[in-house]
Design a protein with these regions (language model features):
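N-terminal hydrophobic or amphipathic helices and topogenic motifs
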Residues: 2-94, 290-324
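Short, glycine-/small- and polar/acidic-enriched structural segments
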Residues: 43-153
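Periplasmic-binding protein-like
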Residues: 50, 54, 58-59, 127-143, ...
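Ligand-binding cleft/hinge of the Venus flytrap
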Residues: 72-81, 166, 179-209, 239-243, ...
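Short helix-initiation/N-cap motifs at beta->coil->alpha
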Residues: 87-97, 112, 195-218, 256
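Hydrophobic residues within well-ordered alpha-helices
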Residues: 99-100, 165, 220-221
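A ligand-binding cleft/hinge motif common to bilobed small-molecule-binding domains
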Residues: 111-122, 184-190, 218-246
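A conserved helix-loop-strand patch within extracytoplasmic ligand-binding domains
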Residues: 130-181, 186-191
Length: 324
């Protein structure tokens, strides 16, 4: 395995790209570089990485007891691959940094961190998660949500529908959320209602960020916002209750948000990578499927092309005027 630029990336660059990252959460780096005679490039002697794989499982709001569930999946993969597999828990940012610093081989990532993992670690998505709450199997909708009794109505065109939001109080999920900010902002730009993300205040009467799906929806339920932007699956427990769901409706939807998936580091040899993918696909089989469902409520993993899967996100980022 070769040492790539990510292995020698300066601390300052990494800090800028991944603000607030706690790299030490993943322990000490076990790899050292050794120059092999008659070779122009350095070869990574991964002390332990040749006989241990590390998988990062990001914590999500709909996941509970994640370490034990991740350990169960790691144990299954270890049995299939014949090598120890270690499960690490951390947020998406820490997962990307672990890939960059060669402290992890595999990570479950949402789409925006997957782009960052490609940029910083040359990692790529090979599998995507399927959920019953995803309308597009391994893509889902970003939705503009209003109170059920709102005077705002879905019109014959997207522009006519969204034009009604001028001067209204808007609750986005967070400035980094794909379905809760990037895709809805890209849609507003596409319809010619705003120029980019920096002009949202010129269109809405108020712009706020809930911090997560639940809080953005609660802002609408409590009358603090006229509309919220979230993922379609957030209109279900545990994000809100069934009673709260019945008080809301979707005003407009934006399709094509890439589902979360599994990224594999480029330092993993091709043959090993294919074995990892095959082992993970065994989680789709009935006798193993509960292990997968327990993680993030996904029912299946499917193979995807990295560039094709993330293309809608790249387009939305460009429309919104946001760097990948």
């Amino acid at each position: 395995m070769k040492v790539t630029n990510k292995g020698v990336l300066g601390v300052g660059v990494a800090s800028v790209a991944l603000t607030g990252l706690l790299a030490s959460a993943f322990g000490e780096m076990r790899a050292i570089a050794n120059l092999i005679p008659n070779q122009k490039e350095q070869t990574l002697i991964a002390q332990g990485k040749t006989n241990e794989l590390v998988v990062v499982f990001p914590s999500r709001s709909d996941s509970t007891d994640l370490q034990n569930k991740a350990n169960a999946v790691a144990g299954f993969l270890s049995k299939q691959l014949g090598v120890p597999v270690k499960a690490q828990i951390g947020d998406d940012t820490a997962a990307v940094e672990a890939l960059r610093a060669n402290r992890a081989d595999i990570a479950f990532l949402s789409s925006r961190p997957a782009l960052k993992a490609e940029q910083l670690a040359n990692a790529r998505l090979y599998l995507a998660e399927v959920r019953p709450t995803y309308s597009g199997k391994y893509t889902y909708n970003s939705v503009f949500v209003v109170p059920k009794n709102s005077p705002l109505k879905t019109q014959s065109t997207a522009k006519a529908t969204l034009s009604q939001l001028r001067g209204k109080k808007m609750a986005f999920t967070s400035p980094t959320s794909g379905s809760g900010f990037i895709f809805p902002t890209g849609e507003l730009v596409k319809q010619g209602l705003v120029q980019n993300r920096d002009r949202l205040n010129n269109f809405f009467g108020q712009v706020a960020y809930g911090g997560n799906y639940s809080k953005a929806l609660q802002a609408v339920l409590r009358g603090q916002a006229d509309v919220a932007a979230v993922s379609e699956y957030a209109l279900n427990p545990p994000y809100i209750t069934e009673a709260e769901k019945n008080k809301l409706r979707v005003l407009h939807k934006v399709s094509g948000v890439p589902a979360h998936g599994v990224a594999i580091d480029d330092d993993v040899p091709t043959a090993t990578r294919e074995k990892i993918i095959s082992a993970m696909l065994l989680l789709n089989q009935p006798e193993n499927n509960q292990l997968l469902r327990n993680l993030y409520n996904s029912t299946e993993l499917v193979k995807v092309d990295h560039n094709q899967h993330l293309a809608p996100l790249r387009n939305a980022l460009q429309l919104a005027g946001i760097q990948p």
